[in-house]
Amino acid sequence: MFNVQSSMKPVIYQVFTRLFGNRNTTNKEWGTLAENGCGKMDDFDISTLKRIKDLGVTHIWYTGVIRHASATDYSKYGIPQQHPDVVKGIAGSPYAICDYYDIDPDIANDVNNRMGEWEALIERTHKVGLKVVMDFVPNHVAREYHSICKPDEVRDLGEDDNSEWHFSSQNNFYYCWGQPLDLSDVCVEQTYQEIPAKATGNDRFFNRPSKNDWYETVKLNYGIDYCDAGGRSDHFNPIPDTWNKMTSILLFWAKKGVDAFRCDMAEMVPTAFWAWATDKVKFMYPEVKFIGEVYNPSEYRNYIGVGFDWLYDKVGMYDCVRDVICGKRPAAAITYEWQATDDIHDHMLYFLENHDEQRIASPFFAGDARKGVPALIANALMLPNPFMLYAGQEYGERGMDKEGFSGRDGRTTIFDYWCVDSIRHGYYQRRKLTNEEKELEQKYKKILKLVNKEKALREGDFYDLMYANQHIGNQQYAFLRKAGKEVILVVTNFSPRMVSIELTIPRHAFEHLHGEPVEVISVSLLNKDKRKLFIYPDMTIPLIIPALSGIVYKTVLPQK
């Protein structure tokens, strides 16, 4: 049990902007923009934003907004065309940025006014009471990076580099000593030329990346020499040139009203830079949040210490809950995962889906979206830390389309032009939703709206009940939340069958709750059922827990 600070619990809704509003149902494999169409920023009108907010959401992460490498030709608008050898898919990866100061033309109705459309979307999002999350991709850029929209006073990345040096702290890139880029492991017939080759984004400091490398990107240089005689050395004095340029990019977008940055592969960038950059950004914009994609639990506290507000809890909580859903671990294993980050729990971002992970409903994961509901109840209601969901999750999107570069892998593509039917139905053609999709949406809405409606769930104390209930620990997970006199009991059931259990409230929890025997009325927050409870030390409560769901009972204790 631990105490938490009073605050609004963030519920982040990730949208892949290019896909979200697309209503072109052609869905041709490897289809072009003209064939398959593309969602636009204007698709997020007030009505759509209100529907998203009504799910219980507080933040929207607009993924893929910054201009990135693409095989689509916008040269008639003065936008440089990207070579297809170094583009993944037709639409391209949103994490191969080719201009940090530009908005992707695909998602604009008026390409020449694409920045104006983004500014208008920020304004609309704020108008309905939601906050804006935007990508920041600090580790790498597209191979043909060249900014055409940077402010006049800004020098471009690589513009002043000395490419004869493999490493210099004042270079923005790493170079392969005059060797040309060799894409023979990627392309049948390479026509793209890069001399000298730049190091590839996933720390490949040689000129021949493989097809499994991030070959379409180049690594940014933050003052670390990865290839010196000792293996690695830091060169942070004087301040590396890249630090200034990347911090200027953050300040540029923060000035436009971006409320939070989701920082891609944050742990591939040195903590020294993050301490320097977050300090400068938060000095100017103290409310701006930094979300870190960090996968090494031993580094969590280091990244929090240098200014990150929230970090992905993937290797711990996500992996655990996924295993519980799939029957590979007992539900009681969840206890260990929150305990592992007990001292930093406010900073851990829980999720069940995002663009990198397989959809719950896909056969690669659970094969049934309903199996994610007990995990949703547990992860969303346990603690005051942020929770994130991915557009389409609330409708049971399976991610099983074969779109092109992405293939059929249980994930929704980030490389191709496509229409995601579950999102199209849920937001623009609701008459086409199935009863199962409507039912799942209502469950998500009911659970997520409780998060900030109930004080005990938003900011209350947490009490894990599993140590006193080891007899139910295989497929059920139970805990209490408490704020003042309000107590909420949550029990989730990962089993596909309804179960009857005897739940023990241990003496320590009883003393924390009230300390004296008392009769109370408990009300279900999911279906409004009521039941009488007599609370006493080491009490046992008979409960019936529905299949693939849970119970959430609220009790208001009397004054002593």
Across the structure, where does each feature detected by a protein language model lie?
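Active-site-proximal helices and loops of the catalytic beta/alpha 8
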Residues: 122, 140, 152-157, 168-181, ...
